[in-house]
């Protein structure tokens, strides 16, 4: 009996067609399955914008890299014609060296999904988000090769930092959030992120 192998994900051309279709709701590919994305609520979008504004002062001022808002990155197969996964974080940072290398190696990159795993991902938790779903996304990001994930919790006014090598660390109030080696020079008391 011949065994059928089912390839998870979708062809790159199909992925691009669906992403460009105005009638297709936004989606991610998680574990090979198409998962519809929930719309961003205003408070989460505002917190992401505020954090991006603070971070970009250091990122742009020191030419450290690029901070993207709600841009999808894909996990391509080795032949780049198949998408095995896609993620759309609230914010993501890619170092200038990695991004410039990617752009130079990929002519026409602007017309294709971003096939580059970010260095840092930031997710802003909405009141409707389930903790188990957020933690699953964190695990997927780290498995994808993201070096660090920040989870911003508006309800608790805290940020939890996840890496592959260290236990999660939660910061709040006067504790200082830093960009570490990824974004040297960035530091702010966590409370500043939640000021109106």
Identify the function of each model-found stretch:
Residues 1-196:
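Gly/Pro/Ser/Thr-rich low-complexity, intrinsically disordered segments predominantly at protein N-termini
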